[in-house]
Design a protein with these regions (language model features):
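Bacterial Sec-dependent signal peptides at the C-terminal "C-region" and cleavage site
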Residues: 14-23
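His/Asp/Glu-rich mid-to-C-terminal helical/loop segments that flank catalytic regions of hydrolases
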Residues: 366-395
Length: 395
């Protein structure tokens, strides 16, 4: 059941239903009733709201959250989290129910302070820029319908249909095939804007777009953990394991469907788009956790691709030296003890792969550059340039 918390100045009133508090004073409410909402309110003391992320079926602390605040016009409130859940530029804020977003300002930590304007009757706060199926629908609606096809990957265990789309050469006989996935971990939303940028260049009225449409078929699954995305789940660390550790036993129909898509397409390139830890050392830069070099189909090709991506990167900086080699930091076999990732399954089961890559897009800050929808789209556009250059170089 959704829970709404009401408080009046220093008084605390918590209700487990959506009934209104009957009072003559201005009532402030804090709840998770917004798209992909996720918050637990523990208490309110004076002008401080004590909150924490709703882990649900996640087996460890994770930092995603989204909350709605109403009735706080003219007030200054402090939001204090149980764990470090505020990103490098503070929360993402919208005062118009998701039409526009901005960073409120701040730094990585447990708290943020927000002064509500006199007309801000309802404000949504998120840990990061959200990206939901309605955003995907809006994006694809703006594209030339002749340049792509849409379909359904499969149905989730709850019966939701997972969208997919194909761009580029639609003949079925493209010289090169690429499969790109997003949201194996439900809360890693900023990476979807990079997916948009890649697609934009596949559809562009340009020499690059023309070459891609003649030579490359791009299959895209924007939301692997679709249910988790719409429900506002953490996604990472689900029990008994999350979607990107499900390529051993296939508990989730969507991961089985992705593996079948790989087997059907026999891609030369696989891209799996992710986001790292919320902030801090190693998490505020675009990077790629590399596979075991003993398993990589073509180490020289992977090195070449990194060099090309670094050269062409725009919007967000990327340096090949920031990649995490296998066996370093968290990128070890222990991290995959609960099951294979999509990439590990692919290199074990597919022939002809040249590139099998995960890109980690930071949530808010990339080597000092602000990570936002447009800077991330621009990075995606540069990735499309790099994909074309790599394939042309490899011919």
């Amino acid at each position: 059941m959704k829970k709404v918390f009401f408080f009046l100045a220093t008084a605390i009133c918590a209700f487990s239903t959506l009934s209104e508090a009957k009072t003559k004073e201005k009532t402030v409410t804090v709840d998770d009733i917004l798209p992909a909402g996720n918050i637990i309110v523990n208490k309110v003391s004076a002008d401080t709201v004590y909150v924490e992320t709703d882990l649900r079926d996640t087996d460890r602390f994770w930092f995603y959250w989204g909350m709605r605040v109403r009735g706080a016009e003219g007030k200054t409130l402090v939001f204090s989290f149980k764990e470090k859940s505020v990103g490098a530029r503070g929360p993402v804020v919208t005062s118009d129910k998701g039409k526009t977003y901005r960073y409120s300002g701040g730094k990585y930590g447990k708290t943020f302070t927000y002064t509500f304007g006199p007309k801000e009757k309802e404000v949504w706060f998120y840990e990061c820029h959200p990206y939901l199926p309605k955003d995907w629908a809006k994006f694809t609606k703006g594209l030339n319908k002749k340049l792509f096809t849409t379909g359904i990957l499969c149905k989730t265990r709850t019966g939701n249909e997972i969208p997919m789309a194909t761009f580029g050469n639609l003949s079925g006989n493209a010289k090169y095939k690429i499969v790109m996935t997003g949201r194996h971990h439900a809360s890693e939303s900023i990476a979807n804007f990079a997916i948009e940028g890649i697609i934009e260049n596949f559809c562009a009225d340009s020499e690059l777009g023309q070459w891609l449409r003649e030579n490359v078929e791009l299959s895209v699954v924007p939301f692997v953990d679709y249910d988790g995305v719409i429900n506002g789940d953490q996604g990472k660390g689900r029990t008994p394991h999350d979607h990107n550790r499900d390529y051993t036993v296939f508990l989730y129909p969507e991961t089985k469907a992705v593996s079948e898509l790989y087997a059907e397409k026999i891609p030369v390139i696989i891209l799996d788009m992710h986001c790292p830890w919320i902030a801090g050392k190693g998490s505020e830069l675009v990077h790629c956790p590399m596979l075991d070099p003993k398993r990589i189909p073509d180490n020289a090709a992977e090195d070449l691709f990194s060099t090309i991506v670094e050269k062409n990167a725009s919007g967000l900086p990327y340096k090949a030296s920031n990649n995490i080699p296998f066996g370093v930091s968290w990128n070890t076999s222990t991290n995959y003890s609960s099951g294979l990732s999509c990439r590990k399954w692919a290199v074990l089961n597919l022939e002809g792969l040249r590139i099998c890559r995960c890109f980690e897009i930071p949530f808010a800050n990339a080597q000092g550059v602000e990570v936002n929808p447009e800077s991330t789209r621009e990075f995606g556009r540069s990735l499309a340039i790099s994909l074309a250059e790599f394939l042309q170089t490899a011919e």
